[in-house]
């Protein structure tokens, strides 16, 4: 199996590209390697579909646990449905690829990236994105590439190119940027409340590196003797577009300038104009070119009408500076925010509305055992904060079957989750697992940013001590040549007919999440910087409205939320608390009706709806793990009697034995002659034998009522730090 391997020196590392060896029947394939990470990426094209008006592109990212030397934990020991992070990586490949294919292309396209080996120093996702571009170029598919992606981290004051998983976790920024020779085409980022300027500089830093990878791809094609297939727009019939422009321009323009109408009224007015045009065309002669063209292509009229509407709306924005709802370019829609809209059985709730977009978010507090276990290639194995996003059909006035979340729902949920993560309290101060669910009740653009705002409201209502409240806004863009307008808080039609969807979330201090998608082949960093800076006053305006509903997290939790107690024990004593076969900890939970989690570090978390029960469980565990010294005096009750002695519970869950010879100074024939089960006695620790058993004595120890002293207080347990 012959193949060619090209090496690229990139930021002090070697990236190896192997072509012609793997997947010979795929349209194009490349194995991208860096360190011990290896990703096989293929691109395949099949015949075109009739009667569709979209690009049927599928991008898949496949993880194989053998890549990390692991066997799946499922019953069948086989990978099943792609985990969430794999789905997000598939979207990461799709988003910069999709705008680079020609608008007329209707062939089935599929890009599959498979992670074959994973080095924790080299995450596979950005290699997969770059590999998708190479495989597509090798397949001879019309494509406005090359395209490449890099990750940028921030450690201290220094940007790090393609950081390791550990560096990502330690840093204040995790930014992925993809670009073409025309500019940046995709941005995805999470930041620790970073100033706008830091994020802009990171994007610029990343794009400079992207340009190196683009040159490397061009050189690869040259070395392989492959000529890139550039998209050429086929000749299209202009009779129908010209007819609609003549017949409908005035009517459409009048509708777009009725700023006081609702979305529904505008949509119905445009539909009426289109229906009138269709009726007029149907009245033309049977051999008329316009009638023949629309009859042979059922989607031609609709697509041409949509294109005309798009052109007129864009012209209105570029020339008049007015949007379809009359807002200025930097104006935010009317905002409404409420906290605590549901009964307190729901731990926290918030209702956020911006224009016609409405999101209901709920927050639920759980125990450490509620954390989500992640069975994928990522080094982190659990999630303590989860955000789930639901988009039912009624939110856009439609009907369709209700199914499990798709890629869009997963992606939007992950973005809103990432926006909140940097402001969540530390685990040792707030040990709850938190789940937020955002229900989109009405959608007219920017539902993901509405979910960010709703999440903040619900978390504050639940009493989660956020470091700072977070809001978000979606920015848009209209570009005709060098004429550019940036739009604040875009609504549905502006997203659909515009060139960019740029979501920015953050606190007053700085940015926590970014996501930018383009419909054009790239933007200069300068324009992206303008959009980021224009988003800040919008975010702060939205945040101000939210804080009118709730300005600080509630002091008390819902009475229906679990109460958690956390403290630390010696990790070497974890086995003592658990007991043989888990008997000890099971007995504590049954006795106190609590839920107990113990981490390997020795952190114990007790969950209960009854504070007294949690306190009791803590005392038992502290008793089990408290060190007992010879000579200490304790008061306790007789728990059981055997022929040779009696057992005393000297601390919660911890017993010692009084040998019959230690019950009295005088000779004792029968244990029951001195003590009975339930008697309260004061004992001294006589010795602790080499098996850890505690031997007690009553001899020489004053009992209550005859001058006995107070029981020594247990040694305090070290607080969490």
From Swiss-Prot:
A single cellular component GO annotation: cytosol
Residues involved in Mg(2+) binding: 495, 501
PROSITE patterns from the UniProt entry: KH_TYPE_1 (PS50084), S1 (PS50126)
Gene3D superfamilies, sorted: GHMP Kinase, N-terminal domain, K Homology domain, type 1, Nucleic acid-binding proteins
Assigned EC number: 2.7.7.8
Residue ranges of every copy of the KH domain listed in the record: 562-621
Domain S1 motif: 631-699
Gene Ontology terms, MF aspect: 3'-5'-RNA exonuclease activity; magnesium ion binding; polyribonucleotide nucleotidyltransferase activity; RNA binding
Record's function text: Involved in mRNA degradation. Catalyzes the phosphorolysis of single-stranded polyribonucleotides processively in the 3'- to 5'-direction.
Protein name (Swiss-Prot/TrEMBL): Polyribonucleotide nucleotidyltransferase
């Amino acid at each position: 199996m012959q193949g060619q391997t090209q090496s690229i020196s990139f930021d002090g590392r070697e990236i190896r590209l192997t072509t012609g060896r793997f997947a010979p029947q795929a349209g194009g394939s490349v194995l991208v390697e860096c360190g011990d990470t290896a990703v096989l990426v293929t691109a395949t094209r099949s015949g075109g579909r009739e009667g569709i008006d979209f690009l049927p592109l599928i991008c898949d990212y496949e993880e194989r646990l053998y890549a990390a030397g692991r066997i799946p934990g499922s019953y069948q020991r086989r990978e099943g449905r792609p985990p969430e992070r794999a789905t997000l990586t598939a979207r990461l490949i799709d988003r910069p690829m999709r705008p680079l294919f020609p608008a007329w292309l209707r062939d089935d396209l599929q890009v599959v990236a498979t992670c074959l080996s994973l080095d924790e120093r080299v995450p596979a996702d950005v290699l997969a994105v770059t590999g998708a571009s190479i495989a597509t170029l090798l397949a001879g598919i019309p494509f406005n590439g090359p395209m490449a992606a890099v990750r940028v981290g921030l450690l201290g004051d220094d940007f790090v190119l393609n950081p390791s998983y550990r560096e990502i976790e330690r840093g204040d920024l995790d930014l992925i940027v993809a670009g073409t020779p025309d500019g940046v085409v995709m941005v995805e980022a999470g930041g620790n409340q970073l100033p706008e300027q830091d994020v802009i500089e990171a994007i610029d830093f990343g794009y400079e590196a992207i340009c190196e990878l683009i040159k490397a791809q061009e050189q690869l094609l040259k070395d392989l003797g492959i000529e890139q297939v550039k998209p050429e727009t086929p000749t299209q019939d202009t009779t129908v577009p010209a007819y609609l422009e003549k017949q409908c321009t005035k009517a459409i323009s009048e509708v777009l300038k009725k700023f006081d109408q609702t979305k529904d009224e505008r949509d119905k007015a445009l539909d009426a104009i289109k229906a009138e045009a269709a009726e007029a065309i149907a009245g033309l002669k049977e051999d008329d070119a316009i009638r023949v063209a629309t009859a042979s292509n059922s989607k031609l009229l609709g697509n041409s009408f949509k294109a005309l509407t798009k052109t007129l709306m864009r012209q209105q924005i570029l020339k008049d500076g007015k949007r379809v709802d009359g807002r200025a370019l930097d104006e935010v829609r009317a905002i409404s925010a409420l906290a605590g809209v549901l009964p307190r059985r729901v731990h926290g709730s918030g209702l956020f509305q911006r224009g016609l977009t409405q999101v209901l978010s709920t927050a639920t507090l759980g125990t450490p055992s509620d954390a989500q276990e992640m069975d994928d290639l990522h080094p982190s194995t659990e999630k303590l904060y989860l955000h789930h996003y639901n988009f039912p059909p009624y939110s856009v006035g439609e009907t369709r079957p209700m199914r499990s979340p798709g890629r869009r729902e997963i992606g939007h949920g992950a973005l809103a989750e990432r926006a909140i993560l940097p402001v969540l309290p530390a685990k040792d101060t707030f040990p709850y697992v938190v789940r937020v669910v955002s229900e989109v009740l009405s959608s007219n653009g920017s539902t993901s940013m509405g979910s960010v705002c709703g999440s903040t409201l619900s978390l504050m209502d639940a009493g989660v001590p956020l470091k700072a409240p977070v809001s978000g806004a979606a920015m848009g863009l209209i570009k005709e040549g060098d004429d550019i307008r940036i739009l604040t808080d875009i609504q549905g039609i502006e997203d659909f007919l515009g060139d960019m969807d740029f979501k920015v979330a953050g606190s007053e201090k700085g940015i926590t999440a970014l996501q930018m998608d383009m419909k054009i082949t790239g933007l200069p960093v300068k324009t992206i910087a303008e959009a980021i800076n224009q988003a800040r006053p919008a975010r702060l305006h939205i945040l101000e409205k939210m804080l009118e509903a709730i300005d600080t997290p509630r002091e008390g939790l819902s009475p229906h939320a679990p109460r958690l107690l956390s403290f630390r024990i010696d990790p070497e004593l974890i086995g003592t608390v658990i007991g043989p076969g888990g008997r000890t900890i099971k007995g504590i939970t049954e006795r106190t009706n609590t839920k107990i989690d113990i981490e390997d570090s020795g952190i114990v978390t007790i969950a209960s709806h009854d504070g007294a029960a949690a306190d009791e469980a803590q005392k038992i565990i502290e008793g089990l793990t408290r060190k007992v010294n010879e000579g200490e005096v304790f008061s306790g009750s007789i728990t059981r009697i055997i022929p040779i002695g009696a057992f005393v519970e000297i601390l919660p869950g911890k017993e010692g034995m009084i040998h019959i010879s230690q019950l009295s100074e005088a000779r004792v024939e029968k244990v029951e002659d001195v003590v009975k089960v339930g008697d309260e006695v004061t004992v001294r620790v006589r010795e602790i034998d080499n098996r850890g058993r505690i031997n007690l004595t009553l001899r020489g120890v004053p009992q209550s009522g005859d001058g006995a002293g107070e029981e020594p207080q247990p040694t305090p347990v070290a607080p969490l730090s």
